[in-house]
Amino acid sequence: MSDIEQRVKKIVAEQLGVAEADIKIESSFVDDLGADSLDTVELVMALEDEFEMEIPDEQAEKITTVQQAIDYAKAHVKAA
């Protein structure tokens, strides 16, 4: 598991109140993990903070699974 994947799963677990062990990369935030629209907004904000990046609203709407969040972070995270 990559560092980014681990960090995304940790954020998802904290934001949605689910166990990290229950989070699969194909998990949908809404359908599988029980997120509502407010949860998804808070999740995007937490991802922005964690990875020091900005996710435009039109992109945020497309991030609906753990894998999509990981892929977005990998593509947009600032190189250390």
UniProtKB/Swiss-Prot annotation:
The modification O-(pantetheine 4'-phosphoryl)serine is found at residue 37. Keywords: Cytoplasm, Fatty acid biosynthesis, Fatty acid metabolism, Lipid biosynthesis, Lipid metabolism, Phosphopantetheine, Phosphoprotein. SUPFAM superfamilies: ACP-like. Its main location: cytoplasm. One of its GO terms (molecular function) is acyl binding. One of its GO terms (cellular component) is membrane. The gene is acpP. Signal peptide: none annotated. This is Acyl carrier protein. It comes from Herminiimonas arsenicoxydans.
